[in-house]
From Swiss-Prot:
Protein name from the UniProt record: Large ribosomal subunit protein bL35
Gene that encodes it: rpmI
Keyword Endoplasmic reticulum in annotation: no
Gene3D superfamilies reported in the protein's UniProt record: 4.10.410.60
Source species taxonomy: Bacteria, Thermotogati, Deinococcota, Deinococci, Thermales
One cellular-component annotation, GO: cytosolic large ribosomal subunit
UniProt-recorded Gene Ontology molecular function terms: structural constituent of ribosome
Ribosomal protein keyword on record: yes
UniProt organism field: Thermus thermophilus (strain ATCC 27634 / DSM 579 / HB8)
Any one Gene Ontology BP term: translation
Amino acid sequence: MPKMKTHKGAKKRVKITASGKVVAMKTGKRHLNWQKSGKEIRQKGRKFVLAKPEAERIKLLLPYE
């Protein structure tokens, strides 16, 4: 059976921590920021841990991470 390939799009967007959690950046900070409050922009600049069902799907795309 051939080796599984890493999904390059998923690899660029998420990181798997040493404990196995999947971490990604929050969305909605690229453009149209003039109408968002400073608090909202600051909060969207942080990373967050994905929910368990999403994390399991991402781990299938990143078999060697």
